C-alpha cells in the first residue's frame, strides 16, 4: 500500500478537514492517507465513515506517538 502523508499540526483547524478530504480524494484505490495530528482524529473518522464511500473504515488505524502526536491511516477502497 502506498499513499500520502499529511502533517496537519501546523494547519489552522478550520482548514484541516477540507485539506484532508482533498488529499484523500487524490489517492488511488488501495492507497492510504497517513495523517499526523495533535489529537486523536476520531471525529474525522466518523465524518469519513459517514460521508466518503471510498473510505475503508475497517482498515483505519491510529497510533499515539506522544502527547501531541497521533498518526492515523485512512485507507481508500
PLM region descriptions:
Residues 1-29:
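An N-terminal amphipathic alpha-helical segment
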Residues 3, 30-34, 69-71:
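Intrinsic-disorder/low-complexity, polar/charged segments enriched in Ser/Thr/Lys/Arg/Asp/Glu/Gln
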Residues 19-23, 48-50, 75-77:
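Surface-exposed beta-strand edges and their flanking turn/coil or helix-capping segments
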Residues 24-59:
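Short, hydrophobic/π-rich interface segment
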Residues 57-77:
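C-terminal edge-of-domain segments
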